[in-house]
Amino acid sequence: MYTSRLLFAPVATALLAAAPALAQQQDFSKVQMTTVKVTEGVYMLTGAGGNIGVSAGEDGVFLIDDQYAPLTDKIKAAVAAISKKPIRFLLNTHWHGDHTGGNENLGKAGVLIVAHENVRKRMTTEQFIQAFGQKTPPSPKDALPVVTFTDAVTLHLNGDEIQAFHVAPAHTDGDAVVHFRKANVVHAGDLFFNGIYPFIDVDSGGSVDGMIAAADRILGVTDDRTQIIPGHGPLSHRAGLQSFRTMLAVARDKIQPLVDQGKTVEQVVAAAPTKELDEQWGKGFLTPDQFVRIVYSSMKKRPAGGGGGSR
């Protein structure tokens, strides 16, 4: 445990603001929701926390993620400016509080919450993320998903076939990708941090290998016209996700030999293995050193005999 605390201590400072238990300490009064029209009937909302996806049409409103509880009224106002129809469904792409913080408010309002079964499992039990040094207590009943799935679930709404499918553990063990088949839009959740190094929740089963494999799954359902809503960062496309995937693979392949040599995390960080990537990717909420620590940790937690995934 002492080694783990040392490993993640530098990460905690950058990420504490996103820890669910500390969300109440943030000043959300100044947060403004911004609406981006992705295509007819599909929108992206940005504010604080993960990007929100919106499907609006004759059948009502379907939300993907809901940021933090204090922002629920602002989210509702942004949705009302798009559609006068009620919010009927909410899907959580994973369990983290910057994507599920509004669940309780929406659940109490009668919104049906959907997620992968591991999201509900984690939300019903205490969680501890080393990077935050933060315990998250079980969520209240109204915040929990009431419909769960294992592999995939499809919603036939607003003239589209909207499929949410699970990927093998990547950012967490409960990640879901939402594919609007007709609109040709994908909400990738935190499987895609556009333009910045991603946080990978190793304590929730995440890994750099899983992130790369998840990017490949998403690329497999997209084409050059697909628009991709990332978990964090601006609206993107297939080329943007491919660039993110390439970065992850390069970082892994630079760090892997150092891990194989038995280097300590401090020695790996000192070697600056991501220096060729840092100018483009290292200016987000994770510094290059923090990202290297996370990748190192995910490699050290691989099962015996496990190696790198696809190239």
Per-range role (PLM):
Residues T35, E58-F62, P70-V114:
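Active-site metal-binding motif and surrounding structural segment of the metallo-beta-lactamase
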Residues G41, S55, D65, V79, ...:
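Divalent metal-coordination and catalytic microenvironments
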Residues K37, G60-V61, Y68-P70, R120-V167, T172-D173, R181-K182, ...:
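Metallo-beta-lactamase
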Residues G49-I52, V61, Y68-L71, W95-T100, ...:
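Solvent-exposed loop/turn segments at secondary-structure junctions
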Residues A19-Q25, G220-D224, L235-R311:
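Accessory terminal helices/loops
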